[in-house]
Amino acid sequence: MNVKDLDFTIDLNEAQAWAKEVLQVKTSLFRWLYDPVPYIDSSLIFQPVLYNLQYNITKEDFREACGRYIDRNPKNYARTNFAFGWGEVILNTFSDACNAILSVLPPKGQVIEHIDGKPIAKENLHMIHIPIFSNDKAFSYVNGEKVF
C-alpha cells in the first residue's frame, strides 16, 4: 500500500466543531503545561489556550484525549487545521491498528528526530508516522532526506 494513494481529506469546519464538542466534554482530561520560553510573550504564558492536542484514538473510543500542550499564540488556535477527523479513516485503512495519535504542530513547529520508546518493540507493535502537510511550506525528513 502506498500512503500517497490514501485520501485523508477533511472538512476543517467539521473538524473544529468536533474538537469544540470534545473540549467541552473531556476538559477534565487535559493537563496544561506552562513552559516559559524566552520568545513567548509573557502575557500568554498562563492562558490555557490550546494549539496542539494529541488524541489517542482507538477503535473503541474516537474521543479519548491525552497529552499536554500550550498555545504560544492564541490567534493560532482558530487557524489550526485539526486532524481529528482523520482518526477513523486511518484506523479503517490499517485494519490491524490498535490506536492512532494525531498531533497538529503550531506554525514553525518542529518534531525533533527520534526513535520511539523501547516498550513498543517488546509489544510487537509497529508505529507508522504519517506526516500530513497543511501548507506548501511544510516538509519532513525521512532517512535524512527532505521530503514534501
Region locations from a protein language model:
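Short, conserved beta-strand element in jelly-roll/cupin
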Residues: 104, 122-138
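A generic structural signal for short beta-strands and their flanking turns/coil linkers
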Residues: 96-98, 126
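Conserved short histidine dyad/triad with adjacent acidic residue
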Residues: 101-122
